[in-house]
């Protein structure tokens, strides 16, 4: 594995750990969800790097996934939800698309679960 790919995965793992710790507190669903999005983004960018391409300077998971969908298959609906989260959880309620401005506990848990599965998938694919 190329060193730059390993770096992306190490940063993804850090975001995943943060998300896992934060999601246990119902008042921290926003940062838990944000770190889930960041984990997913870094996992996808690791795959882009492994293909010898430069990752785009974007946080749009759908766009990044479009570069790697022949290599891995993931739930695009979840990527779309995480795209919304990236903006929604960083600004006051009413500025984003979420009804209450923050994800529910269940949504945050789903985001962490998705980030975990994506991290494992990418790690397994790139380790072989």
What are these regions (language model features)?
Residues 1-128:
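Terminal alpha-helical segments
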């Amino acid at each position: 594995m190329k060193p730059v790919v390993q770096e992306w995965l190490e940063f993804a793992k850090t975001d995943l750990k943060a998300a896992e710790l934060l999601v246990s507190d119902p008042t921290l669903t926003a940062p838990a969800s944000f770190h889930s999005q960041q984990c997913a983004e870094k996992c996808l960018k690791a795959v882009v790097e492994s293909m010898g391409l430069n990752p785009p300077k974007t946080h749009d998971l759908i766009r990044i996934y479009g570069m790697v969908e022949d290599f891995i298959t993931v739930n695009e609906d979840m990527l779309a939800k995480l795209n919304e989260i990236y903006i929604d959880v960083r600004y006051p309620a009413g500025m984003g698309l979420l009804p209450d401005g923050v994800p529910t506990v269940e949504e945050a848990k789903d985001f962490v679960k998705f980030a975990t599965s994506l991290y494992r998938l990418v790690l397994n694919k790139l380790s072989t």
